[in-house]
C-alpha cells in the first residue's frame, strides 16, 4: 500500500486537474450560447438563398448552370471537411474522420479518386498524417469565424468542379442537434440537389435584370459560400457542446477518483495508527 504522503500528493494532483476541467466546462457553456445565436441568425439567409436559387433555376429553363448539372460518371470526388482547431471535445472530430475515411474508401472502391480541403487544425493534422490528397487547408478559424477566411478553400473546389476535374463535392461537418447530440453530416454540395417540389412549381412573380441566367451566375457562388459558412457555425456550436459534456464527465470522474483515493488514504492512516498502538502495547508488555 502506498504511503499516506504519496496518496495525499495524488489527491492534490487530481484536485488541480478538476479545477481545469471545471473551468473549461464553464467556458464552453458560456461560448455555446453565443455560437447557437450566430448559427440561428445565419440560417434565414441560407434558406432564403436556397429559395432564390430555386426560382432562378426554374425561370431560366434554357440555361443550366454547371453547378446544377449531374455528371454521368463520377471519376473524382471532393470533400470539404470542417473540424475544430482545438481538442478536448470528446470523440467529436475522430468520429467524423472515421466516417469520412469509410466514405472515401467506398468511392475509391468504385474507382473514383478523392480530393480534400480541410477547415480547422484537427482535420488538417489528421488527413496529412493519413496521406490523403489534400488540395487546400485553412486553420485558426476561431470561435467567431469569418466568411472571408473560407473563400480561398471554397474556390479551390468550385474551380475544380467547373473545370471538370471533380465530378461531385460533399460538405462534411458536425451538425448541431442539441447540447447532448451532434451528428456527423455528409451533404452533397455539388452538383446542387434538384429544387424541392413546392419551390419548382410555385408561381413566382419576379422580374430578373438583365436576365435570370446572369443573376444565377452571380448568386450561385454566394449560395455555396453561405452553405459552407452555415456548416462551419454548426460545427463550432457542436465543438463547444461536445467540450462542455466531455469536461463535465472528466470533472465527475475526478470527483470519483478523489473519493476513492481519500478512502485509501483513510485506510492507510488507520493501519499506521493501529501499527503504532500495537508497537506501544508491545513495548509496554516487554517492560
From Swiss-Prot:
<dbReference type="Pfam" id="PF00231">
    <property type="entry name" value="ATP-synt"/>
</dbReference>
<keyword id="KW-1003">Cell membrane</keyword>
<keyword id="KW-0406">Ion transport</keyword>
<keyword id="KW-0472">Membrane</keyword>
<keyword id="KW-0813">Transport</keyword>
<keyword id="KW-0997">Cell inner membrane</keyword>
<keyword id="KW-0139">CF(1)</keyword>
<dbReference type="GO" id="GO:0046933">
    <property type="term" value="F:proton-transporting ATP synthase activity, rotational mechanism"/>
</dbReference>
<keyword id="KW-0066">ATP synthesis</keyword>
<dbReference type="InterPro" id="IPR000131">
    <property type="entry name" value="ATP_synth_F1_gsu"/>
</dbReference>
<comment type="similarity">
    <text>Belongs to the ATPase gamma chain family.</text>
</comment>
<comment type="function">
    <text>Produces ATP from ADP in the presence of a proton gradient across the membrane. The gamma chain is believed to be important in regulating ATPase activity and the flow of protons through the CF(0) complex.</text>
</comment>
<dbReference type="GO" id="GO:0045259">
    <property type="term" value="C:proton-transporting ATP synthase complex"/>
</dbReference>
<keyword id="KW-0375">Hydrogen ion transport</keyword>
<protein>
    <recommendedName>
        <fullName>ATP synthase gamma chain</fullName>
    </recommendedName>
</protein>
<dbReference type="GO" id="GO:0005886">
    <property type="term" value="C:plasma membrane"/>
</dbReference>
<dbReference type="InterPro" id="IPR035968">
    <property type="entry name" value="ATP_synth_F1_ATPase_gsu"/>
</dbReference>
<dbReference type="GO" id="GO:0042777">
    <property type="term" value="P:proton motive force-driven plasma membrane ATP synthesis"/>
</dbReference>
<dbReference type="GO" id="GO:0005524">
    <property type="term" value="F:ATP binding"/>
</dbReference>
<comment type="subunit">
    <text>F-type ATPases have 2 components, CF(1) - the catalytic core - and CF(0) - the membrane proton channel. CF(1) has five subunits: alpha(3), beta(3), gamma(1), delta(1), epsilon(1). CF(0) has three main subunits: a, b and c.</text>
</comment>
<dbReference type="InterPro" id="IPR023632">
    <property type="entry name" value="ATP_synth_F1_gsu_CS"/>
</dbReference>
